[in-house]
C-alpha cells in the first residue's frame, strides 16, 4: 500500500515529511489491525503539529465526506496513533473552507448565496464539535468582556468526563491556535435527572 493513497492534498501539492509520517502510520495500522475494512478507502488531506507549553498535539485533517466513517473508528484510531507518536495528543478535524463575507461594493458579486456551512461562525462551531468528539456539547455560554473580547464556555457531556478530561488543555490550545478564540471546557452536573 502506497503512502500517496493515504494523503491527498487539495491542489495536488506534495506532502511534507510530517504528513508522510502520519500517512505511513495509517498504512501500518491498515496492514496490522482490525481497522482494515474501514481504513482501506479513507485518506487525509493534511496534518499539523502544534506546541503548547511543553506538550505537542497532532492535528489531522480529513475530507468532510469521509468524516462520518472516521468518527466510527476515531476512538481506536486516535489511541493507536497516540501510541505511535509517543503520547502526543491526536485530534481529527474535518477540512472546511470559509468563504469571505460578501460586501456591497464587490467587483464580481457571488453568483450564488454563500451557504451557512461556509460561514466563519459555522466553521468555528464545527471545529469545536470535531475537537471534543466523541463527547457531545450540551451547552455553550459566550461571555463578552468590557474590552470586547469573548470567552466561550463550552459545557460537555458529564458521561464522557473520564474519557476526555485529560485532553481538555489540548482542546483549548488547539482551538485557540486554529481560530484565535479563547475557550474553556466544563462538565456541569445534569440538572434534569429524569
Curated annotation (Swiss-Prot):
Per the record, GO CC terms? 90S preribosome; cytosolic small ribosomal subunit; small-subunit processome
Q: Which GO terms describe its biological process?
A: ribosomal small subunit biogenesis; rRNA processing; translation
What InterPro entries does UniProt report for this protein, alphabetically?
Ribosomal_eS7 (IPR000554), Ribosomal_eS7_CS (IPR047861)
Q: Does the keyword Methyltransferase apply?
A: no
GO MF annotation terms: structural constituent of ribosome
State the signal peptide span: none
Can you list the disulfide-bonded cysteine pairs? none
Keywords assigned by UniProt? Ribonucleoprotein, Ribosomal protein
Q: Which family does it belong to?
A: Belongs to the eukaryotic ribosomal protein eS7 family.
Name this protein carries in UniProt = Small ribosomal subunit protein eS7
